[in-house]
């Protein structure tokens, strides 16, 4: 590409009427009283959009044998530009050609024709006319560069900018903004800096539109520091300048900064525009800022902004993303013009809230409005089927896609595959994959995700290597999915090896890569390694997000590592401006409770008392863990008073509290309450807790009756509770029956054999005990030893030791301390 000759100065002579015909005879006729009168009338009509009436006047001039000056044709062409009337403009062009070369080869008319076709996005015709221009001026170049930028031919637009400079035609404040736009679209920051240099040398930096376009360009290129510097140097910032920087912040995920900038803009007294409000709504939606978004809506109302398509769409997007579907409905109902995008947003909003029936109803209304479904509509419906595991709906949508020739759309094909995978039909997902002719990386990754979510690591690996044989190189998403498949299958070491392979292949792990490893470690009981991965992630320069933090806190909870948990809490306070996210607060409450600091858990919860149900659920669970039944019940009873409706997790936690406290009467009251008053259907876990509580209280018959009456098949945990109860009460007649049921339920669980063996030992049935031991040996099962963790103040990491473990490096110290503790306990008991 040619270099930019920046040692130049801009044009000193503006484009003028000197380029019109110079014939004295023609000039006199064109400006005769009659011609002048017609010119003014034509000009007035064109400015009012009355092109046909203007053409009638030109026809009248022809009829009266009046010579038509080039400026009249120029005015009509300009009117066609305003109205985007390509057809009428072509008629004028034909008339010009008919009148001969005197008009057709006139520089003024040639330029006007190029501008007209370019502004109407007729690039081919515009380029042909442009190539025939005898004199190319800044106006014709501006038109060509503008149209190329508009229709996405950004490299061509930049080549035009270079050619202008090489021909010493200096881009002005109309050309430069389009050049900046092209740089931003291509993310060519180095070229953009060159354009910036030209702007400074040509003295255009004081033009607010040029400066704003530079800020916008730097923002799109991700160079926010330079965008901010350009913005700071603008002397008189208008809304366009503020909007440019705000949009840059939002596009680069700096949503908080965008909101702060909006606040500064208002303090400066600059009136916000629709673009301003729409940008703030996007920022609010991205960061879940409900109050910020509502304030933006209020500002739009106060400033009298009409609820047009742009503002209405932004409001819909915001309210749907933050889950305020009722507000989204009100905005939708008040919008006068609704296009397919508008309908898609409200349908998507219903799907996100799990309101599939409402989404389908809106689709029906959309058809009544004579609007056709597009790929987004169908993909949203397919997503609804996937979220609700509604295979029937998914197949109906797929049939619609086939009937209306959408089956070749790769994006839709990937959503169909995802739907089948979520509905548990991976075979059908593979069929869709195989039937798709052109497979892109997204399609390969979709099938890989289906295998990964199901823990089918073997199939995932075959697909992973197969795609590379097909010439499709894996990206970071592909690597993340193959790692996930291994972790879901419990192959921790293989996942770690694959993580290293990803790095050695030149793929840099992203935030999702690290978080996937961390979460997989926690799920597979390797919480200490999860904390190490968090540290390595930070060393690589990545900042943890909310999900990474919740995973790390979960690891601390599993390890009961209060020291590390406090360190992470400190990081949250220092680095996460929106540390009040419910997921983080919930994880903090859970971590502090499981690490032995119930008071700190209460403090975290108390600062946001009753704000969200997940947070309240976590606090009830904490009380249950500590046996604080009174506090758990009080919190449970108070939920509805603050507008929170208990869910299945709430009931599970409060029943667990009753279980820990051994309060069977309170548990029965709550269990009865959810069935009779709340119209909730108890889930299997609720029945399990009640069975466990009844069995622990010696009410074995009642527990058995509850199992027989419940609408679920009993799980192993319930039967274990009954076996333990029978063991305690010496009800030997039930042990044989329950033992068979337990082994049928979970034949590979060593704990079940131990439970049954203990029950037979209490009976004195030693032959059965031996039989259980032999069955375990035949199946290759071993009793898992008890395991404990301890963290020593001032030391890194967590010490792990198991029952009868003599391999620990500090075993002598442990045994000495244990002896001292036993001695103290013995002394205290005397």
Swiss-Prot record:
GO terms for molecular function: mRNA binding. SUPFAM superfamilies: TPR-like. Residues 718-793 are annotated as: Type E motif. GO terms for cellular component: chloroplast. PROSITE patterns: PPR. Residues 1-59 form a transit peptide. It comes from the Eukaryota. NCBIfam families: PPR (TIGR00756). Plays a major role in chloroplast RNA editing. Acts as a site-recognition transacting factor involved in the edition of the site 2 of ndhD (ndhD-2), which encodes a subunit of the NDH complex. This is Pentatricopeptide repeat-containing protein At5g55740, chloroplastic. It comes from Arabidopsis thaliana. The lineage of its organism: Eukaryota, Viridiplantae, Streptophyta, Embryophyta, Tracheophyta.
């Amino acid at each position: 590409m040619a270099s930019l000759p920046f040692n130049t100065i801009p044009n000193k002579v503006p484009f003028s009427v000197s380029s019109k015909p110079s014939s004295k005879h023609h000039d006199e006729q064109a400006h005769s009283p009659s011609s002048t009168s017609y010119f003014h009338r034509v000009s007035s009509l064109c400015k009012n959009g009355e092109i046909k009436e203007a053409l009638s006047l030109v026809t009248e001039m022809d009829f009266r044998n009046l010579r038509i000056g080039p400026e009249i044709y120029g005015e009509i062409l300009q009117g066609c530009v305003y109205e985007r009337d390509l057809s009428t403009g072509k008629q004028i062009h034909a008339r010009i050609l008919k009148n001969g070369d005197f008009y057709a080869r006139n520089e003024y008319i040639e330029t006007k024709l190029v501008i007209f076709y370019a502004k109407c996005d007729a690039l081919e015709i515009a380029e042909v006319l442009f190539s025939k221009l005898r004199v190319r001026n800044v106006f014709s170049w501006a038109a060509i560069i503008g149209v190329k930028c508009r229709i996405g031919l950004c490299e061509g637009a930049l080549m035009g900018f270079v050619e202008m400079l090489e021909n010493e035609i200096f881009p002005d404040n109309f050309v430069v903004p389009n050049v900046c736009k092209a740089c931003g679209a291509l993310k060519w920051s180095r070229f953009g800096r060159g354009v910036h240099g030209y702007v400074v040398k040509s003295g255009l930096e004081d033009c607010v539109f040029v400066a704003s376009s530079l800020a916008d360009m730097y923002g799109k290129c991700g160079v926010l520091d330079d965008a901010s510097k350009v913005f700071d140097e603008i002397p008189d910032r208008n809304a366009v300048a503020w909007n440019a920087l705000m949009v840059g912040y939002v596009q680069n995920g700096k949503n908080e900064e965008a909101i702060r900038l909006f606040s500064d803009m208002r303090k400066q007294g600059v009136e916000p525009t629709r673009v301003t409000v729409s940008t703030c709504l996007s920022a609010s939606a991205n960061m879940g800022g409900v109050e910020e978004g509502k304030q933006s809506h209020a500002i739009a109302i106060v400033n009298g902004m009409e609820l047009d398509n742009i503002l209405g769409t932004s409001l819909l997007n915001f309210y749907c993303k933050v889950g305020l579907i009722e507000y989204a409905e009100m905005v939708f109902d008040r919008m006068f013009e609704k296009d397919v995008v508008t309908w898609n947003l409200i349908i998507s909003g219903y799907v996100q809230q799990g309101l599939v029936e409402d989404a389908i109803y809106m689709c029906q209304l959309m058809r009544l409005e004579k609007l056709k479904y597009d790929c987004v509509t169908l993909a949203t419906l397919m997503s609804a089927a996937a979220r609700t595991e509604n295979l029937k709906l998914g197949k109906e949508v797929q049939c619609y896609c086939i009937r209306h020739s959408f089956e070749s759309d790769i994006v839709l094909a990937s959503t169909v595959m995802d739907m089948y995978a979520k509905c548990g039909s991976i075979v059908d997902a593979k069929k869709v994959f195989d039937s798709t002719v052109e497979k892109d990386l997204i399609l390969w990754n979709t099938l890989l995700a289906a295998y990964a979510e199901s823990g089918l690591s073997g199939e995932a690996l075959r697909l992973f290597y197969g795609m590379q044989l097909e010439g499709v190189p894996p990206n970071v998403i592909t690597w993340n999915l193959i790692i996930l498949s291994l972790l879901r299958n419990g192959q921790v070491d293989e996942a770690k090896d694959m993580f290293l392979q990803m790095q050695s292949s030149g793929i840099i792990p992203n935030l999702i890569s690290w978080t996937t490893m961390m979460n997989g470690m926690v799920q597979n009981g390797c919480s200490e390694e999860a904390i190490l991965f968090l540290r390595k992630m930070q060393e690589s320069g990545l900042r943890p997000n909310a999900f990474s933090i919740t995973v790390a806190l979960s690891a601390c909870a599993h390890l009961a590592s209060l020291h590390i948990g406090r360190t992470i809490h400190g990081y949250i306070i220092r680095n996460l401006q929106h540390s009040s996210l419910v997921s983080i607060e919930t994880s903090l409450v859970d971590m502090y409770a499981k690490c032995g600091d119930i008071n700190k858990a209460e403090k975290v919860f108390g600062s946001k008392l009753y704000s969200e149900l997940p947070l309240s659920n976590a606090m009830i669970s904490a009380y249950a863990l500590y046996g604080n039944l009174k506090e758990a019940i009080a919190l449970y009873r108070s939920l509805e008073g603050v507008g929170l409706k208990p869910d299945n997790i709430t009931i599970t936690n409060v029943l667990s509290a009753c279980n820990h406290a051994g309060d069977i009467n309170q548990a029965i009251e709550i269990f009865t309450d959810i069935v009779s008053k709340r119209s909730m259907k108890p889930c299997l876990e609720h029945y399990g807790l009640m069975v466990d509580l009844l069995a622990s209280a010696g009410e074995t018959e009642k527990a058995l009756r509850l199992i027989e009456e419940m609408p679920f098949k009993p799980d192993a945990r319930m039967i274990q509770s009954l076996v333990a109860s029978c063991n305690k009460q010496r009800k030997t007649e039930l042990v044989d029956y329950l033992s068979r049921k337990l082994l049928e339920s979970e034949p590979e669980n060593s704990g079940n054999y131990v439970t049954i063996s203990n029950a037979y030992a209490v009976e004195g049935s030693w032959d059965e005990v031996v039989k259980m031991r032999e069955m375990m040996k035949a199946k290759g099962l071993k009793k898992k030893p008890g395991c404990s963790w301890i963290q020593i103040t001032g030391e890194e990491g967590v010490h792990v030791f198991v029952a009868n473990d003599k391999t620990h490096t500090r075993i002598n110290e442990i045994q000495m301390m244990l002896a001292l503790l036993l001695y103290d306990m013995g002394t205290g008991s005397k």
